[in-house]
Structures are given as C-alpha cells and as structure tokens.
Amino acid sequence: MKLTVLSENAVLYPGLEGEFGLSVYLEEGDTRLLFDAGERDACLRNAEKLGIDLRRVTAVAFSHNHRDHCGGFLRLAELLPPDVPIYAHSGFFIRKWWDHRCDPPQQETYSQMLELVGPPMEASWFFQQGLTGFRCLADDCMQIAPHVYLLGNFPVPGPEEAVHPSSVLEGPDGRLVLDTFPEEQVCVVDTPAGLVVLTGCAHNGIRSILSTVERRFPERPIQAVFGGTHLVPPDPERIARTADYFRHSSITCAGVCHCTGPMGLEVFAQTVPAYLPTGAGLVWQTPSFARTSAGRKES
C-alpha cells in the first residue's frame, strides 16, 4: 500500500502548493482511491507535479462535507469517468456552519459571525455533471475494494472529545443545532503490517474513532494513522491526552496533520516517537509482507 498527500496546509517540497485542506491519493493493488479533494485545486496541480494522473482514479471518498475536504472536487470532476464510484456517508448534504460567536478570539476578524462551511455542492450537482457513481452510504463498515474499507456511524464522543460548540448544522426545522457529524467516515486499509487509518478531521474525536476501528477489526492492530485530529481550537489537556493515547498505542506511524493545529503538532513532535511530519508531497508505503486471513469483525 502506498499513499501520497496531494493537498495539506503545509508542503514538504518546494514547488508544491499548500492550502487549508486535505487530499490523499491511495494505491492498494489495482485500487486508486482519492480520499478527500482539498478546498480548491491544489490537489490537481500538485498531483501533476508529483506525476500522478488523477484520470486513473478508481474511486473517491469524502470524509465529511466541509469545503476544505471536498471543495476541490468541483474542479476535479471533469477528469473522472462518469461511472467512477464516489462515496459519501448519509447526512453529507446537510448544511454546516461555523459559529464565530462561540470562538471569541476570532470575533474581531470576521464580519459575519456565521460562516457556511459545507457542503460546496448539492445532490443534484453530481447528476448534472453526469457522475452516476455517486452514492451515500449508511453502513457502519463497507468494503469498497480489496482490503479497503470505509467506516462511519461513530458513537457520540464523551466530554473529553466533545465537538466544539462553534460547529453547528441546519436542523430539520431550519434552526442551527450542535453538529454531531453524522456523515463523517474514515478509510481503513488492511495491510499485512496492520491497519492504516485515513481521517479527514476526526470531528467525532480521534481517540473515539480509533477505538471504534479497533472494535470493528478486533484481530488487527492499527499500524499507521494519517490525517486531521481536530485539536483546534487548542485545548492543552485534550492535546496531551491525545498524544498520550498515540504514545501508548500500537501505532508506529502518526502522520497527524491539517486540523491538528500548531500546538498539537508541536506536542506530537516532542512527545510521540511515531510522529511523522506530514504535508503535500509526502509519499509513504507499508512494508511488503505476506497477507494473513485475519480481517474485520462482521456486524
């Protein structure tokens, strides 16, 4: 298994473009999965510079509906075959907002206190583009390719990983309520070396999400984690607990990035031996071992 980070807040090599977003290109056997598409078009230009032909993508998956994870797909769609499978989770088209009134340090920098953060497209857009492979999943765990799974329907995290009150969604009656991120999903690749988990933002709590992965794959250790852990706005105690979780886990590669935030990244760099600086241009692959028959727990 090989992954390449196409879009991220930071870049690892000169000539690549950074943006506040995330996009990862995953290669596993014959599968070419694009996990998230960033906010604008950095993933497109970076892919070209990295020698990756996005026309070869065999599937697309969105971690959740915030524009910094799927906005770039608006520019990418024309490259893809019309029947390419595109996976979102149920709730993907619920409108989401960031309420700056719950984030006092930012109030002076925003003229509007409510910022629409997703989704950047409506359901009809996919069909207008002729993308007939789009589908919304409702499964706890669905295999979308050999050894590649999408996991959703995460439990509401406990108070230590509670969703920040600034994250709100539009309820059935039009009122804004706390966002529980019903559409959030992660990608899990079952490799001979262990599980590789790709997250978008881990709004449902990275520790809670990884614990759910362990319950659904009880015989397989988590080897690597890449993606956002949503440790912003920074809470020193939550960051310390998260770093401690990683430090005492089976994880040998912690490519946390994006919404982990500057404070979170600094703590990981200083205290988590498995930490791997991650940004656009990162190429990482698992060692080659013979595969075992162990797999996920059937639910």
PLM regions and their residue ranges:
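Metallo-beta-lactamase
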Residues: 93-185, 277-287
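Active-site metal-binding motif and surrounding structural segment of the metallo-beta-lactamase
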Residues: 42-93, 217-225, 252-253
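Active-site metal-binding loops of divalent metal-dependent hydrolases
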Residues: 8-10, 37-40, 65, 90-92, ...
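Conserved beta-strand hairpin/beta-sheet module of binuclear metal-dependent hydrolase folds
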Residues: 2-50, 180, 184-199
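Cap/insert and terminal regions of metallo-dependent hydrolase folds
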Residues: 65-69, 85, 175-186, 190-279
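Binuclear metal-dependent phosphoesterase catalytic core
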Residues: 265-266, 274-299
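Short, hinge-like loop/turn segments at secondary-structure boundaries
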Residues: 53, 102-107, 242-243, 271-274, ...
